[in-house]
Amino acid sequence: MEEPTPRDTAAVHRPLRLGANLPPRFYRGGAAIARFRDEPVADDHVPEDWVASPTTLFGEAALGLSRLPGGPLLRHAVAAAPEVWLGPAHVRRFGADPALLVKLLDAGQRLPVHCHPGDDWARRHLGTRWGKTESWVVLATGTADAAVHLGFREQVDPETLAGWVERQDAEAILGALHRVPVEPGDAILVPAGIPHTIGEGVFVVELQQPSDLSVMLEWRDFGLDGDREGHLGVGYTTALTCVDRSGWGAERLASLRRSRGAGRATGPGVERVLPPEADRFFRAERVRPRPEARLEASFSVLIVTAGWGTLETGDGPAAELHRGDTLLVPHAAGEQVLRGDGLELIRCLPPHPEGANDA
């Protein structure tokens, strides 16, 4: 596949509207994504829209990668002109890597309980740069009792966990986790290692580190061969060492969650929605222009969640925004001004290039 040249990408100084990127998955979902985008339902097993993705599915050469309007892969475009896309400070810290993956995720059924390794574990056992800390910003819930499950309620010893997984005792695994009711607007940080699942009917924006690494603790009813696909190729004896088996008390668990309106204001109409501990992995802002909101230059992914409006940059005409739009904003687009009637969006950002954020 021919890569774009630097000249092809150097002219990118304005936001780009992105279409859906729906790799097939093993669990059901996708209808909420189609409704959100006002598009036909593509399939009942496309529950994830990988937005502005520089990442492939685990074990795949290209599946999962996003294409830009006109055809080039985002990964190739960024490699050709990293400072245009990411900004000099980001490139100094992370290289030509966005350090971010964003998804729309529609749980058409409860996901199997699983977890993701951290950076150190991934480097040691897989030779990869990124583990997978993630977060969820809840857009909608399909049931009145919508919930996620995460974190063991009590310490679980290695032998007990290994036995549950070997026997595929789904009831014991799920029953050992905290059940956390959720509603639209909630934001939850999911640290690497913590076992978790998203309940049926929950529709989220997922921000995560740019990897597709999962250790499956449960697969019995999901059409997966866990003995072959569930352990990242290292075997379960090693894979289960990435699991956080500690007990999560109520106060510790509550530190991972922010309800709508409980975030940190970073400017007029802009609210940081995740706990501060998320900033070293990614940042998420809820933007509601009143009547406008100004955003500093940064590589970012915009998910328009309500209303309509415009996005202005220093180059070219204003872009119209409507609910369901997803846009990629290069760093070179500069400062952005948002205006609109009932406009609301989630702005997804990579880790701050200077380390600890000052917000």
Indicate residue ranges for each PLM-predicted region.
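Transition-metal
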Residues: M1-V156, R220-A262, A284, P353
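A short beta-loop-beta micro-motif enriched in histidine and acidic residues
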Residues: D97, G108, H125-E134, G175, ...
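Short acidic-glycine-tyrosine-enriched beta hairpin
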Residues: L177-L189, T313-A333
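Loop-centered beta-sheet repeat module
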Residues: V165-M216
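Short, basic/aromatic beta-hairpin or loop at an interaction surface
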Residues: D157-A170, A297-T310
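Short beta-strand segments in beta-sandwich/barrel cores
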Residues: E292, G307-E312, T326
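Ligand-binding loop in jelly-roll beta-barrel domains
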Residues: D106-R110, T141-A144, I194-L213, A318, ...
